[in-house]
């Protein structure tokens, strides 16, 4: 029979692939060629050769009909595919089990969805990777000699070629398995205690068993923002959950009082994403007095490129099996009492894993040298963002309704124009066209025959990487500017863009305000790898709305204030729409808006990193850095270039693109100029200022080649795990400038807010902060702003050390009417 048989030492560790590669089929050997080299690279740092494993594969002979589905993870054990040829699948499973019996592995690494399904009855290998699992019950009963084999799922090797970050996770998973091939594994159920406190006596008994904790972890579960239970862990060994809604009535007064009194104690408290839990607990009258840590924030400080969810952190820092679907898979309708019991254990497990994770994270932070940065620059600004989240902006509802009428009319008019430009087609639904990537792709590439632009997309459920046609704004602008010559098609493409922008504006204007008439936002401190925040609607607030049929549904309150365009949306022809959107935001009676921002902050940092110190004075004296840059590109006297001239815009955008190593294609999207013209612009820019490439870019590339790590002046660290290609370098070029400016505004913002408790702070935008203050305190605020915001940045800690202290000047604008009418404050 034409089978691929396993090979390797008859001991210890078994490595099981799912479907062999073409080379493996050709040579009738598992784990050879590129796959073997990948595992060798992963294990190199551990000084372990994968050829010391017994290596085999699940599918030992070809099955042509299923080859494509298997490679794309589109299969399940006992699904339609397996049912189509059950004898084949059973044969493969029997052969693998026979190998297990012969080899008697202590640990088996399995790659692929189907082996996971078949051997453990688990689904979704991306969730279970890194877990330590047991074989399925029926296998353990039928074949008791292999009942103690530990199963550790790994992400399929073919997926790791596409995403280098996954190889780091695999290294951690392999390290865990190798450890337990040499020592005894004690199941977490035998090491940890998870209980439920149904009475105050239960809760006090738990507290007495650990009277002096180094820190405690608290976790809450919610339903529609109502607390359902609270979990506590004090020692990383035992955790307890307290039912909150479904307490027994006879225990409710004493148990609630016991919990509230305990939360009020100033014990150092740690949580996963504590901002949400603290916000909810504060709303319910139980604020946490001593917040000392957050596993999500520390995870971002340690490895900003990694996932930050508790499920991932559990997989790399603990031996606890993936459990985040335990409650979801059961469903409350199945058995309400069993559901509640499982929910409470799930809640306690969250508190337990958070405690275990944080202790190991602290050790990692000490080893990597970021513990001081975390304690001084990350956790202290937690309160700043909690305050911003609770502020919001007052909305002028009459102005909002006026703008809605205006932009709905604009959308209808442009949709009518679009219909008139196109012949009827059964594949186009005019009611859903603009918001449907599938229909827009059909219209652009099939109906009009435009040159195809595609991108790679990863299916978050299966991990499948597939190439899809691009229909986003950048792709359409690229077609308009560089790819399409037909003016009629360009007009259609431009109209699609315009309609999309109007649709986006309308959707934003329909964003629900809270019952107090204010629009809110919610900041995420781990928003980007650079340390910049991101923002979204509030997860802790929603409004009930009616649909067209009168049915009620929930809609989150708020929006990302960071993404609201200050000057509207720019169209390919350079015109603007939506430049009046901020008119809906008004100050409270007696208040004014005042916004301060760092002047050309990132460009100044790049200039320092480029060691072009002679250029720094031009940022603050005539003709100004952008006029000077424009003169390099268009020639002439920089003093004669006006801010309204197209040359000024070219200079401004060319500096941004040149600083971060962008190519002519990206600059073309930014400027709406042709690819050829942008090539010339960048050539002239780098010829006039070669220090950016020769000093700054060179230094970044050298640092990545030498250690893959960049450290900012404030001590923020990022390790780059991806391929060292042009995309990675571009990301690295922007890291230090963006991170430095963001951390500068945060350190100053924290002090500013502490010294102005009378001010409201609704928005932070990376290099700027908006405040709403009493009119009579304007001068006091300006003085505070200058005192806190214009502080020197020392580059001695930076990867690219520079002997200079950079002070970034700031600019202020203010308004008494609305946020759209900000004017310079002299």
Residue ranges: model-predicted function:
Residues 1-184:
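A polyanion-binding, active-site-adjacent surface
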Residues 15-17, 216-219, 271, 292-293, ...:
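Short hydrophobic beta-strand that contains or immediately precedes a catalytic carboxylate
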Residues 36-40, 46, 120-138, 147-151, ...:
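Metal-dependent phosphoesterase core characteristic of DEDDh/y 3'-5' exonuclease domains
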Residues 106-112, 217, 267-277, 593-595:
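Acidic beta-strand-to-loop metal/phosphate-binding motif
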Residues 179-246, 263-265, 280, 305, ...:
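Conserved "right-hand" nucleotidyltransferase catalytic core of DNA-directed polymerases
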Residues 230, 274-286, 296-303, 317, ...:
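Short active-site loop/helix that positions an aromatic residue
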Residues 284, 400-434, 438, 685-700, ...:
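Polymerase palm active-site segment centered on the conserved acidic dipeptide of motif C
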Residues 383-390, 516, 520-521, 525-528, ...:
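Conserved catalytic core of nucleic-acid polymerases
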